Structure formats: structure tokens, C-alpha cells
A protein has these predicted regions:
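Solvent-exposed, flexible loop/coil residues
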Residues: 23, 28, 34, 76, ...
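Active-site and donor-binding regions of nucleotide-sugar-utilizing enzymes
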Residues: 32-133
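Short hydrophobic segments within beta-strands
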Residues: 2-4, 92, 175
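Short, electropositive, low-hydrophobicity segments enriched in small/polar residues
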Residues: 17, 99, 145
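Conserved beta-strand scaffold positions in the cores of enzyme catalytic domains, especially
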Residues: 26-29, 89, 136-139
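Conserved nucleotide-sugar phosphate-binding/catalytic loop shared by glycosyltransferases and other
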Residues: 2-46, 53
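Short, well-ordered coil/turn elements that cap or connect secondary structure elements
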Residues: 21-25, 84, 132-134, 167
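A nucleotide-sugar donor-handling region in carbohydrate enzymes
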Residues: 7-13, 113-175
Length: 175
């Protein structure tokens, strides 16, 4: 596993520690972001850093496949690199529509992918309309929902305290 992006930022909880705690083997890590700036300019510089660093790492690792999940710039970079290096690219959650820049990144990633795991039939049909071969598209559901389903119940009092919630007031959960 290569760790980068927001996993290495303090403002997002330096979640590389969670990855380590969960027992995943980390081959290497690198910082994509050149500043704490969330501007479009910083996003493009970060993407450039991902291309440069991941191409070096993937060349050295020589993986059998490149897994490019979701709609994140680093995953788009890995899909571009994998395709250029003739390594099969697997993309998760292609064909989704959000109406944001993420949608464009997701669709572009899908075009570099060879195998697609979609969350639903509509997303699969969208990929087929984009020219992807239906025999390489598999509807597998949403792994995030599976993860939520398998979460152990947390006492309400703990949730209220940890996240500073008041369940006497209306609460909306967005996933």
C-alpha cells in the first residue's frame, strides 16, 4: 500500500496511523500537498506530485494490477500511470454522478480502467454509454454501506460526547 494525500495531513487526523493500526502493510508514503491551501491551484500541484511520485513507485514495484478507487486525484493519477505502463487498472465506484469536479475525475479514471466495480446497475449502464465493455463491469454494491452495516453499536451517550451531539435536537447523517 502507498499512503498519500489527506492521510498525511494533521488537519484530517493524520489517518495513516489508523491504517497502521488496522494492520495494513505500508510500502511507502509521500506528501502530495505543498501547502495547507485548499485552492484549485494547490489541488493541481498535488495532482502533479502524485503523478511524479506514483510513477516512480509503480515502476519500482511492478504490481500485477493498479487499484484506483473512487474519485480522488491520487487514484486518477495511479490509473493514468497503470494504463501507460500496461498494468491492468481496476476502478471502484465508476459511473456515479455527483455534479462536482469529483464526477469528472471519476469518469476520467473509468476511461483509464480495464475492470470496473460499480455500486449499482445505473452506474454500470452509464459506463457502457461511455464506451466501456459491459463484460468488464461488475455491480458489487457499495463497500462503504457494508462497512457501516458491520460497525458495532456505539452507546448513544458515547456518540453525543465524542462528536458533541445533542440527540434531543434533530440530527442528519450524510454519507
Amino acid at each position: 500500500m502507498v499512503v498519500t494525500g489527506s492521510h498525511l495531513l494533521k488537519k484530517y487526523g493524520y489517518t495513516i496511523n489508523e491504517i497502521k493500526k488496522d494492520g495494513f502493510k505500508i510500502y511507502t508514503q509521500f506528501k502530495m500537498h505543498t501547502s495547507n491551501d485548499d485552492t484549485a491551484s494547490e489541488m493541481t500541484r498535488s495532482f502533479g506530485n502524485a503523478i511524479i511520485n506514483l510513477s516512480r513507485i509503480i515502476k519500482k514495484l511492478k504490481p500485477d494490477i493498479v487499484f484506483a478507487g473512487f474519485d480522488i486525484g491520487a487514484n486518477f493519477a495511479s490509473a493514468i500511470i497503470g494504463a501507460h505502463m500496461n498494468i491492468p487498472v481496476v476502478h471502484l465506484e465508476g459511473g456515479e454522478v455527483t455534479g462536482t469536479i469529483d464526477e469528472s475525475i471519476r469518469h476520467a479514471t473509468s476511461k483509464f480502467a480495464h475492470i470496473h466495480f460499480t455500486t449499482n446497475l445505473v452506474a454500470k449502464q452509464r459506463l457502457v454509454k461511455m464506451g466501456e465493455d459491459s463484460k468488464n463491469i461488475f455491480v458489487v454494491g457499495n463497500p462503504s454501506l457494508d462497512a457501516i452495516k458491520n460497525v458495532k453499536n456505539i452507546p448513544v451517550t458515547k456518540l453525543e460526547k465524542e462528536f458533541k451531539l445533542d440527540f434531543d435536537l434533530p440530527v442528519v447523517l450524510l454519507i
